[in-house]
Amino acid sequence: METQTSWLSLWRWGLMIFGMLMICSARENLWVTVYYGVPVWRDAKTTLFCASDAKAYSTEKHNVWATHACVPTDPNPQEMSLPNVTENFNMWKNDMVDQMQEDIISVWDESLKPCVKITPLCVTLNCSDVNSNNSTDSNSSASNNSPEIMKNCSFNVTTEIRNKRKQEYALFYRQDVVPINSDNKSYILINCNTSVIKQACPKVSFQPIPIHYCAPAGFAILKCNNKTFNGTGPCKNVSTVQCTHGIKPVVSTQLLLNGSVAEGDIIIRSENISDNAKNIIVQLNDTVEIVCTRPNNNTRKGIHMGPGQVLYATGEIIGDIRKAYCNISRKDWNNTLRRVAKKLREHFNKTIDFTSPSGGDIEITTHSFNCGGEFFYCNTSTLFNSSWDENNIKDTNSTNDNTTITIPCKIKQIVRMWQRTGQAIYAPPIAGNITCKSNITGLLLTRDGGNRNGSENGTETFRPTGGNMKDNWRSELYKYKVVELEPLGVAPTKAKRRVVEREKRAVGIGAVFLGFLGTAGSTMGAASITLTVQVRQLLSGIVQQQSNLLKAIXAQQHLLKLTVWGIKQLQARVLAVERYLKDQQLLGIWGCSGKLICTTNVPWNASWSNKSYEDIWENMTWIQWEREINNYTGIIYSLIEEAQNQQETNEKDLLALDKWTNLWNWFNISNWLWYIKIFIMIIGGLIGLRIIFAVLAIVNRVRQGYSPLSFQTLIPNPTEADRPGGIEEGGGEQGRTRSIRLVNGFLALAWDDLRSLCLFSYHRLRDFVLIAARTVGTLGLRGWEILKYLVNLVWYWGQELKNSAISLLNTTAIAVAEGTDRIIEIAQRAFRAILHIPRRIRQGLERALL
């Protein structure tokens, strides 16, 4: 009975252990799976290329904004919305802005390279006031007959023959010359002492053409579509585009011209609006038209300054000498300022004052821009001269004045280059009348700081500013950012790659540090370990070679006649090839070429991510998942690479044994010929050895003084000296007295040797099999005894553990019961004592009364 109970207990324990093992084994293992083409990206800096509709504009050789090196624009640009995506943007740290700045500077420099330097014109100019040839009436409020507008200057220049000089004359604007003495008759060009002056080419046009910046293959441009986006921070309405919208690179100050407008309300953008040192970019939600005119009809003349050098200057003016000017609708402008002030009050909650710049270069203190090839500098003090408090900011009637604001402008022909100091250009005069219409789409403002800005009186003063052209580009690129696509992703799945299983061999870590040619002197086996390293370094060499090629092209672009856009096209194409090669290289190393989903035999490590399988695939995006495992991506890649290397090694070893997998191939005629050849070689070897041994035996016997008569000589078998050769009646050991017969003939000799060899091999093989069988039997018996011992040991300790547990439980129960009884008894005594308190009081009172 006790034995039966023990077996039942053992059966229960066995079922319990088996169930636990089943539960543990029920948990499926996860394996690393490679995905190609996942929607993952990261912030990046890359070379953008341009797209433009070049056919709609002049393609003349010296057009500054010539875009014939750009790709044509896509007639149907695609924009893909990214739902459930939140991306951070920062317009103040955007590489696209820096890149556009460099591109526009390069375009300006490249367009002015072949043009004439007018440094020889830095001579004394004898100037007098200019009067017009005839007079016409003018109703413009900007009319001015002041002789201070232009000067008629004469000067000596070198002719085509270097040793001869002649006197020429030209008309210069007053702002372009400075007097060198007090008689106001001798002048010099304004920038001769500080700058290298270069004349813009006669055919150069400064009319900006819309440029679309595009990302190369492997990169994308993210676009923020929030209507109230201020340029920094997270954006929840994100889409992806291949190219930006058409951006006109308008070089202007104070007022942003011909840009894009806000779709909703006016937007105020600043890197830190509480810091008065930071400029404020105002994007309007409605345009204000500005019409600028140079009314006088100029003519242009050419002055030969030497061989191949011609200076183009103003010859004469037909009509009144009138100043240039710009007209703006007062109603539209005041309404715009009112809405801008209202928006600024949301940030400062004070009276908003607009006033003119406090000082600086003429490019900053005026609204400078290019109109029809002439550089205008307009005084905007009339525009920025208003104050908006809480009362008049709500009064829309105050902005209903339908008159026109006319702001006076000056024209300069010697213009300081905006991209760098110490350089200037001479803009040749444009013949005829000039009129251009533009749309004001934004403002560049700065806020006064210190105690003089009236902030202590509840007033904030804002002034127009400019000069940093990056702010102009930011006003258009604020909603874009460049990202690099990361198409390779890894994630855990339940699928495992079926591989050739084989024990892994440890590879020395020093192998990965070998150079591309470091294994040239090693064996083929040792060099095969570093094949992956060699592929990587080969790709790096290709990339480096292409990079050097681009540097050489960039350095010699003036010889190759390449524009900055042509260089960018080359860079974009090379970059796309590099990206593709890099991804395909990794897929090839991992054994995943041509696959979008590639399973591996690398187990997923829970330390990389402790999230469950369902949580990963059902609740996370690829972007979130990549951020989760970003720190372990390199480790995972290396494990996949090692697993693939081991797999290829196993496949090579398997292919080496593949011919043994089909026994029928053993009977192939080619194999039979091989078998016959081997048999003949073995027989020939045995015969040769037999002949050698026979010759050696003969030589040995000859040295002993005798020689056998023939191979048929019977040699008596030696017997012991103390035993007779025979026994009576024919008995005894007759077999031991017989002679050994030598074989007769060549075939008999070969057969005897082969038979002896086979018998020897058979006996040895039989002995080995018997020994192996005896050993296996002994080991099996010992193993069975050890297994039974372990089972009995486990059963014994199980019983002991069970008895100990029962004893511990009984002891605990008894202790708890005794403790409980005592607690109950104490509680009862306390309760009775409380109940007896009134009785004791009554008894005490009775005794006191008695």
Swiss-Prot record:
Keywords: AIDS, Apoptosis, Clathrin-mediated endocytosis of virus by host, Cleavage on pair of basic residues, Coiled coil, Disulfide bond, Fusion of virus membrane with host endosomal membrane, Fusion of virus membrane with host membrane, Glycoprotein, Host cell membrane, Host endosome, Host membrane, Host-virus interaction, Lipoprotein, Membrane, Palmitate, Signal, Transmembrane, Transmembrane helix, Viral attachment to host cell, Viral envelope protein, Viral immunoevasion, Viral penetration into host cytoplasm, Virion, Virus endocytosis by host, Virus entry into host cell. SUPFAM superfamilies: gp120 core, Virus ectodomain. CDD domains: HIV-1-like_HR1-HR2. A lipid is attached at residue 758 (S-palmitoyl cysteine). Residues 153-192 are annotated as: V2. Some of the most genetically diverse regions of the viral genome are present in Env. They are called variable regions 1 through 5 (V1 through V5). Coreceptor usage of gp120 is determined mainly by the primary structure of the third variable region (V3) in the outer domain of gp120. The sequence of V3 determines which coreceptor, CCR5 and/or CXCR4 (corresponding to R5/macrophage, X4/T cell and R5X4/T cell and macrophage tropism), is used to trigger the fusion potential of the Env complex, and hence which cells the virus can infect. Binding to CCR5 involves a region adjacent in addition to V3. The membrane proximal external region (MPER) present in gp41 is a tryptophan-rich region recognized by the antibodies 2F5, Z13, and 4E10. MPER seems to play a role in fusion. This is Envelope glycoprotein gp160. It comes from Human immunodeficiency virus type 1 group M subtype J (isolate SE9173) (HIV-1). The gene is env.
